[in-house]
UniProtKB/Swiss-Prot annotation:
It comes from Fragaria ananassa (Strawberry). A motif (DDXXD motif) lies at residues 273-277. Pfam families: Terpene_synth (PF01397), Terpene_synth_C (PF03936). It is found in: Cytoplasm, Cytosol. Binds 3 Mg(2+) or Mn(2+) ions per subunit. One of its GO terms (molecular function) is terpene synthase activity. This is (3S,6E)-nerolidol synthase 1.
Length: 519
């Protein structure tokens, strides 16, 4: 037996054993939830925190559907909050007044809850699912957050790590695969199923890591053969970073082809951004925008050579993308894709004209345009057609109008980006900022106040995004999840340190692509 055959057989054995353990755990999950409702919720929570919930979707659906009819234990904050969070994450509306039982006669949360650290963490996690106007959840976040921060001074090291991570990375606003490593370390087995879950998660993680590495090879090959890095030397050459967006948004391993395909339009968002922000003259940018709006290959005749190269590559990529979607899903998305690219370039051009004039727009006007220039709409429109679910005239018409599930994610990206003054990769060029526009507009306002305003607006956009989780719409659950994951990825992409580096992003890439989880 040669080495290759032995390796193949070993991997095959691992896969078979992994599949058997998964089936066992599905049975365990059903049985646990049947015998003890709270324990079933705890197990679902662990499955999600380990990033392997895509293996248990049917079981989770069935259990949470039954949980809707269960009256929460009135005196157990952890159970009430956990059930609230899991159901809302799954699209079930649970009223915020379930937490009124934990208030005193004055209508404020009981101070005695400060002794229940586990319950407070669950309350803080639940409060992240709030929507506009839900004052009880706003109060719950402030109350639990304050007491948890206070507790850090007297808890042991292990619990400090858990509490601090909850405050810094609440589950609903974090990427589960990235946070799974922390859960491996901090979670302690108090039942028979957690160790088996961890074992399955480790195998799953290593298998998915190999899949991602193969996708990077495919993406890098496409990018190299495209040749734009040589032709457009002023532009960013970061195919790995572009792929990370796709990897974060589309977490189901079965979506391998979709991740590779999605990275292609993402790369063009960055390239075109650099043309507008770094290299192009205003006159040339106007011509390029007109060409994209016309969407005719003959429209490039009057463009400079580097723009001809970029437009031709964009044109070919988009047509090829449309053909693949049509062959696989029976719908030609070309018209929607053309609209998204034209809208992006129009928004880029608006910004170029602003900065060429030396005048800052009103903050509201800046943000309205910035939602489009973020590129999120382009990415999510392509993603919708790649997923291929619920493609109807109604859903496509709504998609073309930039619905809230897109615009809120885009606003979060734009505002997060604007919180930092650093430019990606120390690039020169035009650079606007909501903070700068707000300061210009509000005389006497300090930069700290402007930043606080921006942070509050990000929180408000998350509430709008949460509302989309709970509102009927024609989009499939896979698209909603991908949109949420995009919003969750944003802090990693835009949290610069003092050296204008992205330490969180580098850590994410290292964990997801290069580090093997020991078995």
């Amino acid at each position: 037996m040669n080495v290759e055959t032995k390796h193949t057989r070993t991997m095959g054995d691992i896969f078979v054993q992994h599949s058997q353990k998964l089936e066992l755990l599905k049975t365990v999950l059903r049985n646990v939830a049947e015998l003890d409702a709270l324990e079933g919720l705890n197990m679902i929570d662990a499955v999600q925190r380990l990033g392997i919930d895509y293996n248990f979707q049917r079981e989770i659906d069935e259990i949470l559907h039954k949980q809707m009819s269960i009256v929460s234990a009135r005196d157990d904050l952890h159970e009430v909050a956990l059930r609230f969070r899991l159901l809302r994450q799954h699209g079930y509306f649970v009223p915020e007044d379930v937490f009124n039982n934990f208030k005193d006669s004055k209508g404020t949360f009981k101070q005695v809850l400060g002794e229940d650290i586990k319950g407070l963490m669950s309350l803080y996690e639940a409060s992240q699912l709030g929507t506009e106007g839900e004052d009880i959840l706003v109060e719950a976040e402030k109350f639990s957050g304050h007491l948890l921060k206070t507790s850090l001074s007297h808890l042991d090291h292990h619990r400090v790590r858990i509490v601090a991570n909850t405050l810094r990375n609440p589950h609903h606003k974090s990427l589960a695969p990235f946070m799974a490593r922390n859960f491996f370390v901090t979670s302690q087995a108090t039942n028979s199923w957690l160790n088996l879950l961890k074992e399955v998660a480790k195998t799953d993680f290593n298998m998915v890591r190999s899949l991602h590495q193969n996708e990077i090879v495919q993406m890098s090959k496409w990018w190299k053969e495209l040749g734009l890095a040589k032709e457009l030397k002023f532009a960013r050459d970061q195919p790995l970073k572009w792929y990370i967006w796709s990897m974060a948004c589309l977490t189901d391993p079965k979506l391998s082809e979709e991740r590779v395909e999605l990275t292609k339009p993402i790369s063009f968002v960055y390239l075109i951004d650099d043309i507008f922000d770094v290299y192009g003259t205003l006159d040339d940018l106007i011509l390029f925008t007109e060409a994209v709006n016309r969407w005719e290959i003959t429209a490039i005749d009057h463009l400079p050579d580097y723009m001809k190269i970029c437009f031709k590559a964009l044109y070919d990529m988009t047509n090829e993308f449309s053909s693949k979607v049509y062959l696989k899903h029976g719908w030609n998305p070309l018209q929607s894709l053309k609209i998204s690219w034209a809208s992006l370039c129009n928004a880029f051009l608006v910004e170029a004209k602003w900065f060429a004039s030396g005048k800052l727009p009103k903050s509201e006007e800046y943000l309205k345009n910035g939602i489009v220039s973020s590129g999120v709409n382009v990415v999510l429109v392509h993603m919708f057609f790649l997923l291929g679910q619920n493609i109807t005239r109604k859903s496509v018409e709504l998609l073309n109008e930039t619905p809230a599930i897109i615009s809120s994610s885009a606003a979060i990206l734009r505002l997060w980006d604007d919180l930092g003054s650093a430019k990606d990769e120390n690039q020169d060029g035009n650079d606007g900022s909501y903070v700068r526009c707000y300061l210009e507009e509000h005389e006497g306002c300090s930069i700290e106040e402007a930043r606080e305003k921006t942070i509050n607006m990000i929180s408000d956009e998350w509430k709008k995004l949460n509302r989309e989780l709970l509102s009927p719409n024609p989009f499939p659950a896979s698209f909603t999840l991908a949109s949420l994951n995009l919003a969750r990825m944003i802090p990693l992409m835009y949290s610069y340190d003092g050296n204008q580096c992205l330490p969180s992003l580098k850590e994410y890439m290292k964990l997801m692509l290069y580090e093997t989880v020991s078995m």
